[in-house]
Amino acid sequence: QADVDPAYNFAVQVKINGAYINYLLPVKYKFTDPVKGELYQPLVVIPSMLLKSEPALRIVINKDEKIKGDLTIQNKKNNIVATPHTNYFLSNNKPDPSVKFNIGSVVMTAKDQAITVGYEIKSDTASAFRFLAKDNNMDYYSSSELKEIKYDHIPYINYMVKPEVEFKKIDVKTYNKKIGYIVGAGDKVPESLEQMGYEVTLLTEKEMAKNGLDKFEAIITGVRTYNTNDWMSKYYNKLMKYVEDG
């Protein structure tokens, strides 16, 4: 849908010529921006803890591979003692021991404080894991990640997704392992290449100026590289010479 459902609605009844008309108005948050003036944005209701899993997708080459990642727990109120979990349990309702967190529980005393917990999972256990965190003070489980879309010309859009890591098991053979990557408008190609076993060097303007390109077996440019990097035109001839040399 184009917009999210409002957290709360205000019921209004209007009487016109003896007829009653009922409609709902979304409750909005009003604030004053020092530059833009008085603004209205949708009211967002969130749980006491927010979670974020990185990476959300993991390429698995070896079926016995141990996957490492990070789970960030953010406190949205004061004084929380949180314990990380996954939704993958054994038949006795105890957490699967194949999922290991490097911290058993975290203590967060300040609002908006965030702590990152490392985890390790055997890739052959399941195809996906969903993460949860338990508020030990309230015996409450949270499994929500907040996504935000913010542009000046539309109201902010906030929505919740489940913090998960998904495993994609593929059969791949890698050759010519050294790759140079010129970052474009923001993508996750370098991370995916590294998961597949390639050695990826990010080629910034500084790197392009000082490095010869002949040490790379391939050079990849990201999405809209020439639109996002003004300096690319200076190295056009250098890149074409790399192509010419094979």
Give the location of each predicted region.
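Short acidic, flexible loop segments centered on an aromatic residue
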Residues: 74-96, 134-136
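Short beta-strand elements
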Residues: 19-55, 139-171
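Eukaryote-biased detector of low-complexity, proline/serine/threonine-rich segments
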Residues: 1-26, 118-130
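An acidic-aromatic substrate-binding cleft motif
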Residues: 155-194
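Helical hinge/lid and interdomain linker segments adjacent to catalytic or ligand-binding clefts
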Residues: 178-245
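Short solvent-exposed strand-capping/beta-turn motif centered on an Asx-Ser/Thr pair
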Residues: 60-66, 73-81, 124, 184
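Helix-enriched interaction subdomains in cytosolic or periplasmic regions
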Residues: 110-156
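Intrinsically disordered, low-complexity Pro/Gly/Ser/Thr-rich segments with frequent PxxP/GP/PP motifs
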Residues: 1, 87-124
